[in-house]
Structures are given as C-alpha cells and as structure tokens.
C-alpha cells in the first residue's frame, strides 16, 4: 500500500501527506481538517508569540484528536550594520510616505521567541515539531526527544540532509526549488544558496540518509505524491496546494493572485524578508532589484518591510506585498482542505488501479 510506511507509522497518520506549516497562513480549521482527513496538519508558528501559539494549539485540539505538528523558525546568526538599516530605510521612505506609515523600530526577538515556542510545544505535548531555517542545538533536541516529540528537519541540499540526520531528526523534508515561500537553506555554499529541483534533490537525499524523506516543492495533487514515492520519498509536504484553500488564512488578494497566475510568474527574492523566498513577481520586487546596497538579513529586512506589506494588502495592492507561491499555481484550487485531501487520495487510487 502506498500509504503504509515508516513515516505514517512514526507520525500516527493514515496518509503520508503533510500540510506545510506556513507562518501567517495556517488556521486551526486548516490544520484540523488535514489531520481529520488522515494527513498531518501543521501550525505555522513562525510569527506567533507564546500566547498565540498556546491558543492555536488548544483550538486545534478542540477540532481534532488526531496527530498534528507545529513548524518553528530556527534562529540564525544575524549579519547587519547600522548603515545597512539606514540605507534601506532611506530606500523604503517613498513607499512608507505613499502609505502614510512611520519608520518602524526594529526589534530582534527571534532567539527568545524560538525558546518560548519550544517550551510551549513541550508543555502542550504537541506530537510533531518541524524546523525551518536550520537545526536547533543539541540540548533542545534532547528535551524534545525526552518529551517523545517527533522531529522533522528541512534540507535544500544533500549536505543539509546529512546534517539533519546527524543532529537526530526523525525525518527530513527535501525542499526543492519549486517550493513557494522561504527557502529552508542554512548551510551556505561559496557561491549561492542551493536551488535544486525536487526531482533531483529527493533521490539524492534518499540515497545517503537512513531516515524517512518527505518531498516538497511543486507537489499539488496525487500525481506529485506518487512521483515523489517513486523517487524514494516516504511522504510529501504541500504548501501552495493548501494555501489557496478557503480554510487557510490567505487573503483573497493572495488567493486570487495564485489562482490566476501561471508557472512562469514566480521569482526567488530577498526583497521582502532578507531571506530567499519564492513568490509572484511584482513592482516591489522589480524595484528592489535596482537597490545597489546589501539587503539586511532576516529578520531585519522582514521588520523593515512589514508595515508596507500589511498596508498594501489591506488596500488590495498586490504590487507592494509578498505573494508567496510555488511553481505549480495552475493546479491550485479554493476547495476546503478535506476536499483537497480526498481529491488527492482518490486520484492516487485511480492511478494505482490502472497500473
């Protein structure tokens, strides 16, 4: 059976389908619907404070008794100078003026927020913890394992996958370059961050690690799930497929933009957050490409552009806000999450029937 393997057993799920923990875009209804449909729903906790995360976990538990996960951002070493911030603020001033915004005060609370997230996950006995942007330190991994929490890391290269396994992850998401949103890269090669496609990345990781591999990037339906399994993955993680669901927290602006876009419309940019992320190209990205200075690293740039993005989204201006999307938007739907899950499963079963 395609849906019975080490991953489904480890995560206590019926189908090896994980809804990506998209920070700012998941809702308790989305998470619970995926879990109730036999997959693993995941709370995107990246931007939550402690109380918000506790409330989200409690709400999900009211809606499902099945397994679910929480995705957290691993803090990275920030490299920035005051002149970088000053220069970026000067560049962003016309956007703020047009939207009647003040210059923000940058607060770096990443490390503290991450520690609180880990404490909350342990306190609330969340079944699964997923990591993006790196690997937590040994003591955090030990604490989570002592609490019997399953750990899923993210890799965009073979070296990152090996590092995840050595650190003690129970499974690895192999994030191909087709994936929407932020790249999960954390080992920086000499030239640039890895941009390896899913079909190339998955089998190369499968061949060098002994733990289950979860394919991610461009997977939207049953065909993508089965293709991933053929490549050696034991499951898939899907983001954009659930982002456009009516159960997600995506704005109508973003939902419509994805549904009406095509595979050539996305680019990978640091313009909005200081980390490479794939989204639909727009005026802000185009104009930021002309910026001659160094874009401050995440989370600095994310803080500097936050009010601009929110204000633009509030007035329906898709040219000045981030529109994260993977490279398969033509396959996106606005169905409820449980319908998306049942359609995927039915399509897989139909394909298997004819093979």
Swiss-Prot record:
UniProt entry keywords in alphabetical sequence: Detoxification, Flavoprotein, FMN, Monooxygenase, Nucleotide-binding, Oxidoreductase
Reactions mediated catalytically: 3 propionate 3-nitronate + 3 O2 + H2O = 3 3-oxopropanoate + 2 nitrate + nitrite + H2O2 + 3 H(+)
Entry EC no(s): 1.13.12.-
Binding site for FMN: 71, 175, 180, 218, 237-240
Cofactor(s), by name: FMN
GO MF: nitronate monooxygenase activity; nucleotide binding
Keyword Flavoprotein carried by entry: yes
Disulphides: none
Record text on cofactor binding: Binds 1 FMN per subunit.
GO biological process: response to toxic substance
Cleaved signal peptide residues: none
Role: Nitronate monooxygenase that uses molecular oxygen to catalyze the oxidative denitrification of alkyl nitronates. Acts on propionate 3-nitronate (P3N), the presumed physiological substrate. Probably functions in the detoxification of P3N, a metabolic poison produced by plants and fungi as a defense mechanism.
Further comment: P3N is a potent irreversible inhibitor of the key enzyme succinate dehydrogenase in the Krebs cycle and electron transport chain. P3N has been shown to be a toxic metabolite to bacteria, plants, fungi, mammals or any organism that uses succinate dehydrogenase.
Stated family: Belongs to the nitronate monooxygenase family. NMO class I subfamily.
Protein name in UniProt: Probable nitronate monooxygenase
């Amino acid at each position: 059976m395609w849906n019975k393997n080490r991953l489904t057993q480890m995560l206590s799920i019926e189908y090896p389908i994980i809804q990506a923990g998209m920070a700012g875009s998941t809702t308790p209804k989305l998470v619970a619907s995926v879990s109730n449909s036999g997959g693993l729903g995941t709370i995107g906790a990246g931007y939550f404070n402690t109380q918000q995360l506790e409330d989200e976990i409690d709400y999900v538990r009211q809606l499902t008794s099945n397994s679910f996960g929480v995705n957290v951002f691993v803090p990275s070493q920030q490299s920035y100078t005051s002149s970088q911030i000053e220069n970026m603020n000067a560049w962003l001033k016309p956007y703020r003026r047009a939207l009647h915004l003040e210059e923000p005060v940058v607060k770096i609370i990443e490390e503290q927020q991450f520690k609180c997230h880990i404490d909350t996950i342990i306190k609330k006995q969340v079944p699964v913890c997923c990591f993006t942007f790196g690997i937590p330190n040994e003591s955090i991994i030990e604490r989570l394992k002592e609490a019997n929490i399953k750990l899923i890391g993210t890799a965009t290269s073979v070296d990152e996958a090996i590092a995840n396994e050595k650190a003690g992850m129970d499974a690895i998401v192999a994030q191909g370059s087709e994936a929407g949103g932020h790249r999960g890269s954390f080992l920086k090669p000499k030239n640039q961050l890895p941009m390896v496609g899913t079909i190339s990345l998955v089998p190369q990781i499968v061949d060098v690690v002994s733990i289950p591999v979860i394919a991610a990037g461009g997977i939207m339906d049953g065909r993508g799930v089965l293709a991933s399994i053929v490549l050696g993955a034991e499951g898939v993680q899907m983001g954009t497929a659930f982002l456009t669901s009516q159960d997600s927290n995506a704005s109508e602006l973003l939902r419509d933009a994805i549904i009406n876009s095509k595979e050539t419309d996305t680019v990978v940019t640091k313009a909005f957050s200081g980390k490479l992320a794939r989204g639909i190209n727009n005026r802000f990205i185009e104009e930021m490409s002309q910026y001659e200075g160094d874009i401050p690293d995440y989370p600095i740039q994310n803080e500097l552009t936050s009010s601009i993005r929110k204000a633009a989204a509030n007035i329906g201006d898709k040219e000045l806000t981030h529109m994260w999307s993977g490279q398969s938007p033509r396959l996106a739907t606005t169905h409820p999450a449980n319908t998306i899950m049942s359609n995927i499963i039915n399509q897989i079963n139909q394909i298997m029937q004819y093979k």
